Amino acid sequence: MKTFEDLFAELSAKAARRPEGSKTVAELDAGVHGIGKKVVEEAAEVWMACEYESDAEAAEEISQLLYHVQVMMIAKGMSLEDVYTHL
């Protein structure tokens, strides 16, 4: 099972290596505006899944939102600690 920290490390490594065909790299190349659209889309899907779908489907949507939020963090040059200081 992957943790929030594991995912961030994996995505950071992909951002540094920039493997060809990586969806993470493509999203980073879309910039903050493009990533922001994905964050908003996924947030809406989380809401709808929590309202109308199973807990498993809601958890999957939440995991996708967390992925896109972490991509945004990387695009902005933020670390986990930058966010943790506000929790």
Curated annotation (Swiss-Prot):
- What domain of life is recorded for the organism? Bacteria
Q: Which organism is it from?
A: Kocuria rhizophila (strain ATCC 9341 / DSM 348 / NBRC 103217 / DC2201)
List the taxonomic lineage.
Bacteria, Bacillati, Actinomycetota, Actinomycetes, Micrococcales
Instruction: Determine if Cytoplasm is one of this entry's keywords.
Output: yes
> Which EC numbers does the record give?
3.6.1.31
For this UniProt entry, what is the primary localization, expressed as one broad class?
A: cytoplasm
GO biological process, any: L-histidine biosynthetic process
UniProt lists the family membership as follows: Belongs to the PRA-PH family.
- Which keywords describe this protein according to UniProt? Amino-acid biosynthesis, ATP-binding, Cytoplasm, Histidine biosynthesis, Hydrolase, Nucleotide-binding
Q: Which InterPro entries does the UniProt entry name for this protein?
A: HisE (IPR008179), PRib-ATP_PPHydrolase-like (IPR021130)
Compartments where located: Cytoplasm
Q: Which PANTHER family does the entry mention? A: HISTIDINE BIOSYNTHESIS BIFUNCTIONAL PROTEIN (PTHR42945), HISTIDINE BIOSYNTHESIS BIFUNCTIONAL PROTEIN HIS7 (PTHR42945:SF1)
Q: Please state the gene responsible for encoding this protein.
A: hisE
Q: Which Pfam families match?
A: PRA-PH
UniProt name for this protein = Phosphoribosyl-ATP pyrophosphatase
Q: Which CDD domains match?
A: NTP-PPase_HisE
**Membrane-spanning regions, if any?**
none
Which reactions are catalysed by this chain? 1-(5-phospho-beta-D-ribosyl)-ATP + H2O = 1-(5-phospho-beta-D-ribosyl)-5'-AMP + diphosphate + H(+)
The molecular function terms in GO held by this entry are: ATP binding; phosphoribosyl-ATP diphosphatase activity
| Pathway(s) | Amino-acid biosynthesis; L-histidine biosynthesis; L-histidine from 5-phospho-alpha-D-ribose 1-diphosphate: step 2/9
Mind naming one GO cellular-component term on file for this protein? cytoplasm
